[in-house]
Amino acid sequence: MTVRVGINGLGRIGRGVLRAIFEIEEYSKQIEVVAVNGSLSAKQHAHLIKYDSVHGKFSGDIDFNESQNWLSINGRKFSLYRERSPENIPWNVDVILECTGAFNKREEAIRHNAEKVIVSAPVPDADVTIVYGVNDDMLEKEHKVISAGSCTTNCLAPIVKVLHSSLSIKSGFMTTIHAYTNDQNVLDGNHKDLRRARACGLSMVPTTTGAAKTIGSVIPELKGKLDGTAVRVPVSNVSMVDFTFTTDKKATVEEINEMFKDAALSSTSFQRVTLESNFWIPVSATRMTSEGTKMTSEGTRMTEGYPMSNVLSICEEPLVSIDFVHNPYSAIVDLTGTYVTGDICRVAAWYDNEWAFSLRMLDIALLSHSKV
């Protein structure tokens, strides 16, 4: 069953969502883009979709018509609108992917005329907050405004779920070492956050994040037990979660790492990250052996059955942030960064804060439509 979607906002996440639909067969087979809404001309949007300074050149064919207000990718045409008010957009779709960052309250998101609205940001009064692979079972048919949380919440939540299910977390504190975003200034300028007002490429910028507190909406038994902060750093993409926590049950470094290995090895599209094999295989790049075990196109063995499929992976090599650009996983746990000192434990995980989150938006869109 094809899902008809509209994308509101063609910034970093909106363009990532659009690109993923046409770049990954698993999505292009199931999702039809009916319309997008953005503030630029058709020519400008087409150019920014085609050429991306972080993710590289899009390999597909892109066309546009300025006077008729449409874009076309790989021969599939869709409408381009330039409306500021959601109620003025004639979507005619099943699901809206709200990627502007401007409509982060339920009363605002509900103004879209669609069965489902999935917001790419925390929405305190959303019908539900879904972190794909972690609390999918909380999604109900009647939920209309669905928050996908944030890129950081999507990294932290799978880690917390693995740890909490085995060790029972008592409390925790997260620091996200985060790439700069368009919410910061290239050079010093106006911003309500005086630190984000400063030049993003020249300093580490301490700032805020609600990612840790959002976990309480995703894993209710941890409500009020986690908090966190953020430091924006001078890189254009890929971030890291540094999570320190205490637990009811004691564990060694080796035991904690084994938990993540078991979780990742049970994922339906797991690939161990190595220096020799730093290539991210989308969900569709799989085949079945005669025994029924899935294999990647490179021959990497995978197993079935774990609910965090396609969201959790591990890394045991000494990699750096740029090695994870365009990585599809929500969290790649760096096993070399696990520590235990007395009652305090620490784990770290990488995430492509643009690409992986864009994919999770689409995963939730497919999941929500299956509930209709």
Model feature map: region roles:
Residues T2, G228, M240-L265, E304-V372:
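C-terminal active-site/capping subdomain that shapes the small-molecule cofactor and substrate pocket
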Residues R4, N8, R12-R19, D63, ...:
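Active-site-lining helix/loop region of Rossmann-like oxidoreductase modules
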Residues L10, G101, C151, T207, ...:
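Structured loop/turn residues at secondary-structure junctions
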Residues V34, S79-Y81, D227, L312-C315:
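General small-molecule cofactor/ligand-binding pocket signal
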Residues S150, N154, L202, Y351, ...:
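Short, conserved micro-motifs enriched in small and acidic residues
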Residues S269-V283, R287, K294, R301-E304:
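A cross-taxon signal for low-complexity, glycine/charged-rich
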Residues M288-S290, P318:
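Short linear/disordered segments characteristic of secreted peptide precursors
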